[in-house]
């Protein structure tokens, strides 16, 4: 059942985003779809389609691993790619997440920093 829920979430989120954007355009039919896709991403309709694809991948990852694990992996990858600890801490501070998750992200950064030494 978990696999089914993950697939529904991965397919459902981009669809929901598109439906909401179509509703926000105030248009109907093909014009609504065109306007919604153009509004979703950079570069017009093609960018909107790409944005929905990326949104699908992200939502599938969140459904499979959880938001905490995804955020933690991103913080660790930023460090491995050479970003400074200070710049990563600034990014963590700006993330729209709970204080508890920010604390865990800082702890993840500390652990990976200790392993690198």
Give each language-model segment a name.
Residues 62-117:
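Amphipathic, membrane-inserting segments
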């Amino acid at each position: 059942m978990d696999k089914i829920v993950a697939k529904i979430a991965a397919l459902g989120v981009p669809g929901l985003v598109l439906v909401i954007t179509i509703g926000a355009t105030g248009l109907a039919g093909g014009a609504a779809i065109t306007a919604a896709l153009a509004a979703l991403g950079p570069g017009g309709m093609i960018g909107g389609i790409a944005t929905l694809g990326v949104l699908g991948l992200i939502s599938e990852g969140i459904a499979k691993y959880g938001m905490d694990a995804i955020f933690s992996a991103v913080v660790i990858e930023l460090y491995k790619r050479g970003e400074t600890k200070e710049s990563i801490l600034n990014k963590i501070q700006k993330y729209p997440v709970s204080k508890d998750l920010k604390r865990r992200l800082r702890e993840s950064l500390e652990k990976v920093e200790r392993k690198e030494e």
